[in-house]
């Protein structure tokens, strides 16, 4: 039976159905906004206490039913109800209602005709865990031989939920489900299904059951809690909510990193290793604690193998200018791949010009995968160093790093692994990989800019002369001779970037608390969903379709320049990179000069991907002007 819904008096600043983001708003976002407006209006808990009603034919409340003062700012910015909602949004709201009585009260005070379940009224099959509890992350899905790589084809999703609901367990880690959903939350979802007449655009038939494309797999974190950890995600760009899809360029920073930097400057700021006062001790302790955090993150054998640098670019240059200059000569060979960022090409070109060594390049196939057969043909006794990326910044391809390293070592070559694009997506174990050097930048893994890491095997670092000279890296200086400190100090000349090293330590600790296995599983599903959405757009060509890839969705759209697409998306609040991504050789391998590159992180959502796809479709059909 169709219910008759009365009209609602006009409320200032409510979005209309013509708003491009109208269909992208989840119920969770709606209720969060309502709660914020209640708090801004100064409504007490008593005023907003729920009054459960059982009305056979619920109707929309009039403005007089709103438990807030009637002023233009009291309920401003409340988004209009969406015209469709997916299983994920409904499950998130149901879980939030059960876990947050304040949120339930806010919903009930605004929409009194909705009867919300409470945790006390629902039979409990298992306790509802906290919304953010990384320690309960289930066992990871099957993993490819490469460390931390989860292949697309190894994450099956059954067509129906299990009889016990959607609770994830270590013994059943491939089921459909939403994080920690159990029977209690399932009952709440059913209650929400039966009360949707307060949203006139919604019908129970328009809401899918708890199966489908948005299964969360073995994910063990609450995406909305994660997003609340990143203040910048609340920003608006051109009047739209910020959608940050430029994560391959840089990642956003969680509040814990911002707070750690602030604490350092307020309570610990000093130079390190060279004073007897209290602040110097605090600063030194914080700096060296960050080094230990990096060691733990990479599973290095010792903190003496961890060198702080400005970033990946400086780390590669350090190896090329120090170890390379000491060990390469005319006739020797350096091997890189077509996938490399310019920062892993130019230093080796310069070294080749200086020493007479030859630069060899491993080709890739039409999917963007390294040709291992061709790589083996390039290796010989002349090969002195192989330097390659673990994840392509332009295509997202995950290279078979362990195999590449093992083959190089058979010929006595050293190996540098560029982890700039891998550390935020995959668990890295430098001892298991057996790489000689591993490099990455802090800002790519939710840390500050201007700080990075060079990991090197201790025997290599000890045998390498420093690239730069100055204070902090010497043991003794006379006019006749200088004795250098052992590694890592010998490579950290001058006053280092102390505060940002401390901030990097906080970022890595944050990532490890969530768990890179959980992050990889969630991002895998984002990538699958995004690939499916973009593949359906007429004229769109995805660039880089390797079966093992990280969260990059480079594409071109027939008839439109990448730069124009990037500008149009920016007007919709969507940040992507449009250009050559400092990787011109690999784009030219595909006959291109530039692409549009959406790149994902674990704070992105399925709804954001749908917003992106909808905007691209509007560009393609001409309804979104360039």
Curated annotation (Swiss-Prot):
Residues 226-626 are annotated as: Cysteine desulfurase domain. Keywords: Encapsulin nanocompartment, Plasmid, Pyridoxal phosphate, Transferase. Disruption phenotype: No growth phenotype for a double srpI-cyd deletion mutant in the presence or absence of sulfur. The modification N6-(pyridoxal phosphate)lysine is found at residue 444. Residues 1-225 are annotated as: Cargo-loading domain. Residues 1-21, 41-64 are annotated as: Disordered. It catalyses: (sulfur carrier)-H + L-cysteine = (sulfur carrier)-SH + L-alanine. Gene3D superfamilies: Aspartate Aminotransferase, domain 1, Type I PLP-dependent aspartate aminotransferase-like (Major domain). This is Cysteine desulfurase. Its EC number is 2.8.1.7. One of its GO terms (molecular function) is cysteine desulfurase activity.
């Amino acid at each position: 039976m169709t219910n008759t819904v009365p009209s609602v008096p006009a409320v200032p600043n409510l979005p209309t159905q013509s708003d491009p983001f109208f269909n992208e708003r989840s119920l969770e976002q709606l209720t969060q906004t309502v709660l914020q407006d209640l708090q801004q209006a100064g409504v007490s808990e008593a005023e907003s206490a729920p009054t459960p009603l059982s009305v056979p034919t619920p109707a929309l409340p009039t403005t007089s039913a709103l438990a807030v003062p009637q002023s233009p700012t009291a309920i401003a910015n409340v988004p209009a109800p969406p015209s469709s909602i997916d299983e994920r949004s409904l499950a998130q709201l149901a879980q939030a209602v059960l876990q947050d009585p304040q949120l339930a009260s806010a919903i009930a005070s605004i929409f009194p005709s909705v009867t919300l379940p409470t945790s006390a009224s629902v039979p409990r099959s298992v306790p509802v865990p906290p919304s953010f509890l990384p320690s309960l992350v289930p066992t990871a899905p099957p993993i490819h031989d490469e460390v931390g790589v989860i292949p697309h084809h190894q994450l099956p999703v059954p067509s129906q939920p299990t009889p016990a609901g959607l609770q994830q367990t270590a013994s059943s880690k491939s089921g459909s489900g939403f994080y920690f959903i159990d029977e209690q939350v399932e009952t709440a979802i059913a209650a929400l299904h039966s009360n949707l007449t307060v949203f006139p655009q919604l019908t129970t038939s328009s809401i899918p059951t708890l199966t489908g494309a948005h299964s969360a797999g073995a994910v063990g974190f609450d995406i909305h809690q994660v997003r609340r950890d990143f203040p910048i995600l609340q920003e608006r760009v051109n009047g739209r909510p910020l959608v940050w899809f430029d994560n391959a360029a840089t990642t956003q920073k969680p509040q814990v990193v911002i707070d750690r930097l602030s604490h350092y400057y307020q309570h610990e700021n000093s130079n390190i290793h060279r004073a007897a006062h209290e602040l110097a001790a605090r600063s030194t302790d914080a700096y060296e604690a960050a080094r230990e955090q990096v060691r733990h993150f990479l599973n290095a054998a010792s903190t003496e193998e961890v060198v702080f640098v400005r970033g990946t670019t400086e780390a590669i240059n350090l190896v090329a200018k120090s170890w390379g200059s000491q060990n390469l000569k005319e006739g020797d060979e350096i091997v890189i791949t077509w996938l490399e960022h310019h920062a892993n090409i130019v230093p080796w070109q310069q070294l080749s010009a200086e020493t007479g060594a030859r630069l060899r390049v491993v080709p890739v196939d039409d999917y963007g995968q390294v040709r291992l057969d061709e790589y083996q043909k390039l290796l010989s006794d002349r090969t002195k160093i192989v330097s390659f990326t673990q994840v392509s910044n332009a295509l997202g391809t995950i290279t078979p790093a362990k195999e590449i390293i093992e083959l190089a070592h058979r010929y006595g070559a050293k190996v540098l692994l560029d982890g700039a694009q891998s550390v935020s997506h995959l668990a890295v174990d430098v001892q298991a990989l057996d790489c000689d050097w591993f490099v990455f930048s802090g800002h790519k893994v939710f840390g500050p800019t201007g700080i990075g890491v060079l990991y090197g095997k201790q025997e290599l670092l000890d045998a390498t002369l420093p690239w730069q000279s100055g204070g902090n890296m010497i043991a003794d200086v006379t006019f006749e001779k200088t004795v250098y400190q052992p590694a890592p100090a010998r490579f950290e000349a001058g006053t280092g970037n102390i505060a940002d090293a401390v901030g990097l330590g906080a970022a890595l600790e944050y990532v490890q608390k969530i768990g890179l296995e959980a992050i990889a599983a969630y991002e895998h599903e984002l990538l699958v969903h995004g690939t499916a959405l973009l593949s359906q757009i007429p004229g769109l060509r995805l660039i880089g379709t390797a079966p093992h890839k990280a969260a990059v969705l480079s594409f071109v759209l027939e008839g439109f320049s990448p730069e124009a697409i990037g500008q149009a998306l920016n007007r919709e609040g969507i940040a992507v990179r449009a250009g050559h991504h400092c990787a011109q050789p690999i784009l030219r391998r595909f006959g291109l000069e530039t692409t549009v590159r959406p790149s994902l992180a674990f704070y992105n959502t399925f709804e954001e991907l749908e917003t992106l796809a909808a905007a691209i479709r509007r560009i393609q059909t001409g309804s979104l002007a360039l």
